[in-house]
Amino acid sequence: MTENLTEKIIMKIIIKIACFLSIITIPAIQIQSQESLWKIYDQRNSGENEVALLSNTSEASINNLEHSEKVFPELSLYCEEGSPNISIKINWKRYISSFNKTEIGIKIDGKNYTWLSFNLDKTGQISFQNPSTHSNELINKFKKIKKLAVEIEPYSEPPINVYFNLSGFASHLENLKSICSQ
């Protein structure tokens, strides 16, 4: 009888300790995951045209039909040599179009899509905006939101939608601006 009572007490203590540990570790894991959403690359001495790059990977993969694989697009903000202005680009990691420009729908916190013109690089995989009023407006909007939806329609294919978790963006943007202004 006393053994049974002792086992029950020990089990209750173990359960309380487990609950306590989960209360402590879950916020730490959430903070760590928000930190790992963003990666900043300081490329000042690399010889690259891009001085610094802040990037975030999409929440889910998309199909790359050319290579029969799944890929995760990357949203990046960057500055170039000799200019503190910040530009936006999305590396779709798959072919989008052979045209020089494309339209991309940006949905901020569940509102309607706003369609913006983006340039495409020579590979047809990376869409980008030069530092302009639109880039600055978008960056300011990104600071206020947690989730970004982006839609693009590859040449002769149905639209592709990707989502980016922008948690922690504002603080990482400040780090990027600091590197770009040096």
Predicted regions, residues:
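Hydrophobic alpha-helical elements and their junctions with loops/disorder across both membrane
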Residues: 9, 25-29
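Bacterial N-terminal signal peptides that target proteins for export
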Residues: 8-18
